[in-house]
Swiss-Prot record:
Master enzyme that delivers sulfur to a number of partners involved in Fe-S cluster assembly, tRNA modification or cofactor biosynthesis. Catalyzes the removal of elemental sulfur atoms from cysteine to produce alanine. Functions as a sulfur delivery protein for Fe-S cluster synthesis onto IscU, an Fe-S scaffold assembly protein, as well as other S acceptor proteins. GO terms for molecular function: 2 iron, 2 sulfur cluster binding; cysteine desulfurase activity; metal ion binding; pyridoxal phosphate binding. Pathway: Cofactor biosynthesis; iron-sulfur cluster biosynthesis. The keyword Iron applies. It is found in: Cytoplasm. The lineage of its organism: Bacteria, Pseudomonadati, Pseudomonadota, Gammaproteobacteria, Candidatus Pseudothioglobaceae. GO terms for cellular component: L-cysteine desulfurase complex. The gene is iscS. Signal peptide: none annotated. The modification N6-(pyridoxal phosphate)lysine is found at residue 206. InterPro entries: Aminotrans_V_dom, Aminotrans_V_PyrdxlP_BS, Cys_deSase_IscS, Cysteine_dSase, PyrdxlP-dep_Trfase, PyrdxlP-dep_Trfase_major, PyrdxlP-dep_Trfase_small. It catalyses: (sulfur carrier)-H + L-cysteine = (sulfur carrier)-SH + L-alanine. Its cofactor is pyridoxal 5'-phosphate. This is Cysteine desulfurase IscS.
Length: 404
């Protein structure tokens, strides 16, 4: 069996070799295996220094104070901690939360849990390009709104929300603003010293770091209070208890440091590859690019091939590892809720493929993907009676199908 070409970088990234080498130094008896909370001896001091350095590295990439970085097990936990933490701490101020229908499941399901606890959540529709209309957000704000949670970059369609304007609007109305930045760190410049953002979630494995590691930015000035969701030894200033995984933290810090040094050059290369991929598909019939192409990260191309089932196409192009939806929900055969929120019908949503490219993608891999996808789409359409009807000029949306 040949190993498929990896083009699913939004699902996860391989750990960078430089990151892995740093992590290994904090695992074995010959390295620095200490507990950073052991402040009475050398091993603990060394681990604590490593954790402090990593905290600084993460803060440097996003232009924040290292004291504002709270370690977590990943962006899912960070989103839970941010949203539940604010809701529970400030529930006497209000019980209304606003979010977007295209958010990651870890935001949407957290909001649904809060609804079961008596909170009210407004789920906003995006525009057809995936972006949020600020007027819609403004109209949804109320006296009892305590939190707005909007992701920076969408995991399926790669669009970049205007978090600067959203944050300003939130702060004008004394509302806390949380941003899920799992898909934007290392791809989009972030300066939290200039943005009106109160909480921001990060994931290491989306940026060539280890899985099971994340962070939450919690603004200190003006101070944001959150109620802990995990209790124990009072680690992370009482916000997230649990022994710190030094090797994981070091890995995340190194991944963020590499991103800070190489992001601009890497984005240029990845954008060129993404554009090459787009050019390879755009002249095909009945091809639709999902999401805004201007306000978008360089490595994402979500594209629908009409009259082809996405699942069938993925099986046909199994020499390329791609996705037809979020990694957390792609086991379902339901059409993507993100694409449905953009207004796509079931057929077009089902025919979508998400190509995401990254640090190790090559021009040869792009060309291979273009040739393979074009050939398989043509073959699958040749087998489709719907394609024949379309080619004969039949408006399939107006066909009344009889049940058998």
């Amino acid at each position: 069996m040949s190993i498929p070409t990896y083009m699913d970088y939004s699902a996860t990234t391989p750990v960078d070799e430089r990151v892995a080498q740093k992590m290994i130094q904090f695992l074995t008896k010959d390295g620095n295996f200490g507990n950073s909370a052991s402040n009475s001896h050398y091993y603990g001091w060394q681990a604590d220094e490593a954790v402090k350095k990593a905290r600084q590295q993460v803060a440097n990439l996003i232009d924040a104070d290292p004291k504002e970085i709270v370690w977590t097990s990943g962006a899912t936990e960070s989103n839970n901690l941010a949203i539940k933490g604010v809701a529970h701490f400030y529930h006497k101020k209000g019980k209304h939360i606003i979010t977007l229908k295209t958010e990651h499941k870890s935001v949407l399901d957290t909001c649904r849990q809060l609804e079961r606890e008596g909170f009210e959540v407004t789920y906003l529709d995006p525009m057809s390009n995936g972006l949020l209309d600020l007027n819609i957000l403004r109209d949804a704000m109320r006296e009892d709104t305590i939190l707005v949670s909007i992701m920076h970059v969408n995991n399926e369609i790669g669009v970049i929300q205007d978090i600067e304007s959203i944050g300003n609007l939130c702060h004008q109305n004394n509302i806390f603003f949380h941003v899920d930045a799992a898909q934007s760190a290392g791809k989009v410049a972030i300066s939290l010293s200039e943005l009106s953002v109160d909480l921001m979630s990060f994931s290491a494995h989306k940026i060539y770091g280890p899985k099971g590691m994340g962070a939450l930015y919690v603004r200190r000035k003006p101070r944001v209070r959150i109620e802990a969701q995990m209790h124990g030894g009072g680690h992370e200033r009482g916000m997230r208890s649990g022994t710190l995984a030094t090797h994981q933290i070091v890995g995340m810090g190194e991944a963020f440091a590499i991103a800070q040094a190489e992001m601009r050059e890497e984005n240029t290369k990845i954008r060129q590859l993404r554009d090459r991929l787009l050019v390879g598909f755009i002249d095909m019939e009945e091809v639709v690019v999902n999401g805004d192409m201007e306000s978008r990260i360089p490595g994402n191309l979500n594209i629908s091939f009409n009259y082809v089932e996405g699942e069938s196409l993925m099986m046909a192009i199994n020499d390329i590892a791609v996705s037809s939806g979020s990694a957390c929900t792609s086991l379902s055969l339901e059409p993507s809720y993100v694409l449905r929120a953009l207004g796509l019908n079931d057929e077009l949503a089902h025919s979508s493929i998400r190509f995401t490219i990254g640090r190790y993608t090559t021009e040869a891999q792009i060309d291979k993907a273009i040739d393979l996808v074009r050939a398989k789409v043509d073959k699958l359409r040749d087998l489709s009676p719907l394609w024949d009807m379309f080619k004969d000029g039949v408006d399939i949306s107006k066909v009344e199908w009889s049940a058998h």
